[in-house]
Amino acid sequence: MALTTHSGKLIPELQFKAHHFIDKTTVLYGPSKTGKTVYVKHIMKILQPHIEQILVVAPSEPSNRSYEGFVHPTLIHYRLWLADKQKKNDNKGAERFLEAIWQRQTMMSSIYSRVNNIDMLKTLYHKLPIDIQQKENKNIAKVECLKAEQTDQKKEEKITSLYQQLLKKIIIQNIHMYKNLCLTEDEKFTLNYINLNPRLLLILDDCAAELHPLFTKEIFKKFFYQNRHCFISMIICCQDDTDLPANLRKNAFVSIFTNASICMSNFSRQSNRYSKQDKEYVEEISHIVFKGYRKLVYIREDENRQHFYHSTVPLPTAFSFGSKALLKLCKAVYSKEVVIDKSNPYWSKFRLTF
């Protein structure tokens, strides 16, 4: 339900949808205990049918256990760091962590693009028995006609995606038919990875101290500016809007403010370069929005051209994020043993010597 200001301006309520977050960057701003993690879990629930992989970096997880019951422990990191066997105690662990994710996602993206090649999918479709093709040709023809008639680029991309999904669905339903056929290496490759979902959800929860040295690094900029090309959906939780530099703050697709003072600070900050109209609007609506559990949501590229919304989400109930295959692998490698970081200089004070 929309809220109304004293001057009669409307503040619509936003019902979150998957398209708000898939392959985009979302940033939540607010002090501790203002509901950031509740929103993260709500977004996770929305994305669960669409994304099968997740990584969480949450330094405070050992004490607050925010993601327990939602994300398998093997997928939760307490620091943004990846070891290097060649070097010890260096300060590039965080950079290596992001590089490893980026390289993996780049490969996943390449495989996905190869598998979803329209010409290859059409070739495989036409290798199915004639009776199956005759049954499906009507639906195929409809989509092909829509694609041929479309002049709007965005709509054409949606129809192309629909065409891909239709061809893949038919191929998957009849995949046993290819078993005894003579296939090329490319055709075998496509069939082998046709169910691949390359998407990854990366959550960086209150990692400001570890992220700060990375702001000028190319790898971190890639996660902000090019994440959609590698199918990375990123959620960053910050205590304050200054935890991110202005150029990165402005590039977030969705910004969620859980506290009135941080919201006002963000939109009045000169470096963020919001218009005078936006600043005045936020100043007026903040007194109305931030009551009870309501938060303010700002969508940078809003198809409705509204940009500002209020939102309230329910408390989450536990669910396990990730595909069955991922969770099976996690259970296989999981150890309940607490691992001590022996690179910590204070380890020498506590270790036993005989």
UniProtKB/Swiss-Prot annotation:
Alphabetical keyword list: Late protein
Alphabetical list of InterPro entries matching this protein: P-loop_NTPase
Induction conditions: Expressed in the late phase of the viral replicative cycle.
Entry similarity comment: Belongs to the asfivirus B354L family.
Name of the molecule in the record: Uncharacterized protein B354L
Organism annotation: African swine fever virus (isolate Tick/South Africa/Pretoriuskop Pr4/1996)
